[in-house]
A protein has these predicted regions:
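N-terminal glycine-rich phosphate-binding loop and ensuing alpha1 helix
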Residues: 2-58
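Short beta-strand segments
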Residues: 6-10, 52, 100-101, 127-131
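Acidic metal-phosphate-binding loop of nucleotide-sugar-dependent transferases
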Residues: 14, 78, 103-107, 134
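Residues at the starts of beta-strands that form the adenosine-phosphate
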Residues: 47-49, 97, 124
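Acidic helix N-cap motif at the loop->helix transition within catalytic regions
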Residues: 58-64
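Short beta-strand-to-loop acidic/aromatic patch adjacent to the donor-nucleotide binding site
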Residues: 94-105
Length: 148
């Protein structure tokens, strides 16, 4: 079973409050996009990778090592960007299995991705569910403190 993957990196990162868009920020010597790609490229089942970028961010994209990927111009919203990538994907034969990931979230586990791929063999749709942790903590004086 083979897959194509859409890596969404076309957002404006408005909430991030930085001139440099979030997917291009580095942890160590790799951008968030490159960290995601490094993990994704470990999976032989993923045959085609589309990186959806914001046209305004091409100067950042050119500096990255985006091996084995095809760049696609994104839309105004995440939904538009996903749709544009899916339209490109339709043109490729035998590409019915699609994975979608947000480039600004590189801390996914490869174990989770393995499970998604495995479950895809038995199901037409797989959506991972992760437990969330509270962002509000109770301190010693029985008061709630918002952790940012």
């Amino acid at each position: 079973m083979s897959f194509s993957l859409i890596l969404l990196a076309a957002g404006n990162s408005n909430r991030f409050k930085s001139i440099l868009p979030k997917p291009y920020h580095k942890i160590g010597n790799k951008s968030l996009i490159e960290i995601s790609l490094h993990k994704i490229l470990k999976f032989k089942q993923i045959k085609k990778i589309f990186v959806v970028i914001n046209e305004k961010h091409q100067k950042y994209t050119k500096k990255l090592n985006l091996k084995k990927t095809q760049l696609i111009k994104g839309g105004k919203t995440r939904q538009d960007s996903t749709f544009l990538a899916l339209k490109k994907l339709i043109k490729i034969k035998n590409k019915k299995n699609v994975l979608i990931h947000d480039a600004a979230r590189p801390n996914f586990s490869t174990k989770l991705l393995s499970k998604i791929i495995l479950k895809s063999k038995m199901n037409s749709t797989v959506i991972p569910r992760l437990n969330i942790s509270n962002a509000i903590k109770k301190n010693k004086k029985n008061r709630f403190v918002n952790i940012k």
